[in-house]
Amino acid sequence: MKIGVFVPIGNNGWLISTHAPQYMPTFELNKAIVQKAEHYHFDFALSMIKLRGFGGKTEFWDHNLESFTLMAGLAAVTSKIQIYATAATLTLPPAIVARMASTIDSISGGRFGVNLVTGWQKPEYDQMGMWPGDDYFASRYDYLTEYVQVLRDLWGTGRSDFKGDYFTMNDCRVSPRPSQPMKVICAGQSDAGMAFSAQHADYNFCFGKGVNTPTAFAPTAARMMQAAEKTGRDVGSYVLFMVIADETDEAARAKWEHYKAGADEEALAWLTEQSQKDTRSGSDTNVRQMADPTSAVNINMGTLVGSYASVARMLDEVASVPGTDGVLLTFDDFLAGIDAFGERIQPLMRCRDHIAPVTREVA
């Protein structure tokens, strides 16, 4: 099972809590995180894109770096780890994304891929006059289908004459082309999102579910496998989890309860409000899971809370779920968390026993 890190491109990472570590996103922080991840043989690093935050006492995600420029910088200071940036497709023409991706492919020596998102938070785009109207919720995967067709044309042949409802290419050119086939990943959990991933993506991200229920996402992975069977393609699932680990189960649980007790209710109310704007995509979208009150303090990603041994055991359970190709990890404290993962958790994982033990780098 592959291991990735979901780098904190926005302030405070993924904990919407006054009790969680409070920090701003910087290149130096993300550089340290990804270089540590590479040192411990993580397979990939991904950054999201967020153009407007949730506010509240913690100003959650009100402060964000930009994904492609961040990952270009990280590509230049790493040598092995795969690097993925996220394209907010409403804001960037596909021909520009194709050229940016080809550039970072050159910087990274063929280690780059692109995560495509349709956009779900209207204020992110409305603030720039770029929201196409609420009918977009129902047509966004039609838009994305044309978008990825243009990308594949340009990456594959260097030229596109695509004509569609959303994009018109007139002998559009991109050169140099990527040195390797460009990986495309998506994060669809709705039926439309999974159908898109089955047709066009190499991997599909999904949320883990619950606290210490590592296989609860299995029905989602099964749906992705079923969708891929219809297209005759192999599209594995990468599952999002937060790791909160310590020497003992009790110590880790105490940290988790402390974070929950400091939940930023104002920021969470904003998330809930935005999740209700899309009435077209069904009840199984990513944003609706994010806003579920069960564990909204970390946007309801699957949460693994326990001793290093307990977390290792639960990650092995994740790996046992059919259709699972990897996990995308966040941490309550990224720098300490990655060190603990590399030194204390990964060596105990059966699914990572091919990785030689690594000790902490000397600064």
From Swiss-Prot:
Q: Which residues bind FMN?
A: 49-50, 115, 124, 140-141, 190
* UniProt keyword annotation of Transcription regulation present: no
* SUPFAM superfamilies given in the database record: Bacterial luciferase-like (SSF51679)
Q: Could you confirm whether the keyword Repeat appears in this record? A: no
Q: Which GO terms describe its molecular function?
A: alkanesulfonate monooxygenase activity; uracil oxygenase activity
Briefly, what is this protein's role? The FMN-N(5)-oxide reacts spontaneously with NADH to produce FMN. Requires the flavin reductase RutF to regenerate FMN in vivo.
- What is this protein identified as? Pyrimidine monooxygenase RutA
Which species expresses this protein natively?
Answer: Klebsiella variicola (strain At-22)
- This chain is encoded by the gene named rutA
